[in-house]
Amino acid sequence: MPGLDGDWELQRLSGVLPPLAGMHKQIRGDRGATVLPGGLRVPFAVVAHELRYRPPFSMVVDVLEAEGGGWHGRATVFGQTVGEFRMSRRAT
């Protein structure tokens, strides 16, 4: 199973997620951020295989499952799945 530490490319798979082009996730230990185009960071805490966003987005949790060399994610709002995405390690 791959670890979560690192920099991750995002690919939208389904749901009401916006296009994820130009967005990526950076994860270091128990914290990380989704980095939006232009560099704006949306921080989250890493708890097991969940990315729990900090206020004002604390109703959002990304639930991750290992898939191949990356991760399959379900974006949830108030516990309801609103979209799915794939995380692949960024080339260095």
Regions found by a protein language model. Name each.
Residues 4, 60, 83:
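Residues that flank catalytic or metal-binding motifs in active/ligand-binding sites
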Residues 16, 29-70:
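Contiguous, well-ordered beta-strand patches that form the walls/edges
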Residues 7, 77-92:
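Edge beta-strand at a domain terminus
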Residues 1-3, 67-72, 87-92:
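Mature soluble binding/inhibitory domains
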Residues 9-11, 52, 88:
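Residues in well-ordered beta-strands of folded domains
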